[in-house]
């Protein structure tokens, strides 16, 4: 047996994964709940504990099935800060704006394990659709000296990748 070191990806104990989604039709809106698991690498946790805020974005795209045409694209932005004087973690949700504090980072990540979306602005006819979702650490908001190393370090690869679920609407909204 021949083994070649370095050719297989290293096992990681961190990353973002999309577990499942739930959809509910309400009066004039499609409610989508994304269930995900977020685990930060040691480098990301160390940066956070040393005053670097982390920005996480969850994106949702509603598409017409088969055509690949995007009908609606929405995202939710989150910012995590460590507050050293109080030893608390602060989670800021950009839209709708809210700020919460938590005693441990695991509590912040548990809060982010469920992300809610409401797609209400555009009427949809009954039919076949797809919901595409991804979550990632948004590196565009990182301090400039950290951006280049983040592009090449495996410790900063926090991206679930796109995941697609089918959606069938029996009645329009």
Mark where each language-model region is.
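N-terminal onset of structured domains
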Residues: 11-54
């Amino acid at each position: 047996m021949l083994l070649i070191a370095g050719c297989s990806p290293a096992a990681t104990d961190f990353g973002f994964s999309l577990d499942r989604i739930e959809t509910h039709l309400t009066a004039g809106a499609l409610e989508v709940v994304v269930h995900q698991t977020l685990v930060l690498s040691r480098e990301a946790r160390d940066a956070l504990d040393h005053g670097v805020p982390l920005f996480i974005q969850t994106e949702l795209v509603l598409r017409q099935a088969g055509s690949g045409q995007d009908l609606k694209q929405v995202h939710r932005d989150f910012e995590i800060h460590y507050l050293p004087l109080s030893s608390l973690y602060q989670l800021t949700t950009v839209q709708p704006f809210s700020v919460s504090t938590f005693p441990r980072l695991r509590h912040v990540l548990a809060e982010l394990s469920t992300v809610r979306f409401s797609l209400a602005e555009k009427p949809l006819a009954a039919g076949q659709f797809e919901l595409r979702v991804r979550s990632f650490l948004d590196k565009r908001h990182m301090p400039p000296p950290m951006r280049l190393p983040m592009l090449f370090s495996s410790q900063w690869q926090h991206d679930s990748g796109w995941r697609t679920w089918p959606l069938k609407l029996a009645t329009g909204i």
